[in-house]
Amino acid sequence: MFGLAVLTVSTSGSQGKRDDSSGQAIKDLLEGDDFQVVRYEIISDDKDTISGKLAEWADADDVDLIVTTGGTGLGRHDVTPEACLAVLDKEVPGMAEAMRAKTLEFTPMAMISRSVTGIRGNTLIITLPGSTKGVRECLDVVMPVIPHALELLHRETVSEHPR
C-alpha cells in the first residue's frame, strides 16, 4: 500500500469559497487497493507555499505519491508547475506528455496545459488541472504506470516489467 497525498491549489478553495471537487475526485479515483490517503490539504496559489508543502510531504516517510490539482493553466496566479519544478530532483516528462497527448483527443485546450511530473527522493509528484474532468482524464492515462514507477523508486532493481 502506497501513501497518497492530495494537494489542491486554489486560493478561493483555501478560503472556503469553493468546494474541492477535483481533490475529492483524486481521492475517489486512487484510494483503494494500492493507495491510502495520508495527507490532504487545500492551499492558496502562492509559489513558496506550494513548494514548501510539496517538499515537506515528499520528504515524509509515509508519502509515496503526491497529486496536485489546480494552478497549471496560463492565468497570472497559476504557479503550480514552477513551484513543483523548484523542488524536484528529476522530471518525468513522459507522464505529463502522455496526459497532454491523450487529453488533446478530448479538447484542444490540452495544448495550454503546463502540468509537470517528477520525483523528489522516493516520492512521485504529479500536477493536474483544476477541473474534475481534467483530473479524471489525466489520471486515466497515468494510473496504469504509477504503481510500477513507485516500485522503481523504492528498490534498486525490478525484475519484471509490466506488459
Question: Model-derived features: where do they sit?
Answer:
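Non-catalytic beta/alpha edge segments that cap or flank active sites
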Residues: M1-R163
